[in-house]
Regions:
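Sec-dependent bacterial lipoprotein signal peptides
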Residues: 1-18
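Thiol/disulfide oxidoreductase modules built on the thioredoxin-like
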Residues: 92-96, 103-148
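Hydrophobic beta-strand anchors of alpha/beta hydrolase catalytic cores
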Residues: 44-45, 74, 120
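Short active-site neighborhood of thiol/selenol oxidoreductases, capturing the structured segment around
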Residues: 36-56
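N-terminal "domain-start" segment that seeds a small globular fold
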Residues: 18-37, 98-100
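Active-site acidic short loop of glycosyltransferases
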Residues: 39-41, 71, 96-97
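Structural microenvironment flanking redox-active thiols in thiol-disulfide oxidoreductases
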Residues: 56-94, 105-110
């Protein structure tokens, strides 16, 4: 009887550990992930909205920056916190090629929703906000900031 209980407890512990490895960060137009997979990487988060003209103008710049910098994870996050069904046609309309977080960055890195958009955050490999930008960015401005940040570590 004792052996049977011990085996059940061990099996339960294994199931708990396996469930802890799940992908708990939901991503549209990319692979779901978890914080352990993101730790140790530079990350860029861009808040945008479809009613924000500077945001729409910035999207091709983000796409180009991401395409040229494979060693940083680039994500967008919709300011209006749209669900996937609502986000899908808008992302297609504006040709957003980078993955979009569905999980709020607040729940991942503690980033509060900014008061206005566009807003861009660089997160260092330790998971800390390295730079907060509250104006439209270009591929060149993002590259310059990213190079400066990498050189500080």
């Amino acid at each position: 009887m004792y052996l049977k209980k011990a085996m059940i407890i061990q099996l339960f512990c294994i199931l708990v550990l396996v469930s802890c490895q799940r992908n708990d960060i939901e991503v549209f137009n990319g692979s779901n992930t978890n914080i352990n997979d993101l730790n140790g990487n530079w990350i860029l988060i861009n808040y945008w909205a479809d009613w924000c003209a500077p945001c729409i103008k910035e999207i091709p710049e983000l796409n180009d920056f991401a395409a040229e910098n494979k060693n940083i994870k680039v994500y967008t996050f919709n300011f209006d916190e749209l669900e996937i069904d609502d986000l899908k046609p808008i992302a297609k309309k504006f040709n957003i090629k980078v993955p979009s977080l569905v999980t709020h960055p607040r729940d991942i890195w503690g980033i509060a929703t900014p008061p206005a958009v566009p807003a861009t955050y660089f997160i260092n490999p330790n998971g800390e906000i390295a730079v907060s930008l509250f104006r439209p960015q270009t591929k060149d401005s993002l590259n310059k900031i990213y190079i400066e940040l990498k050189n500080t570590i």
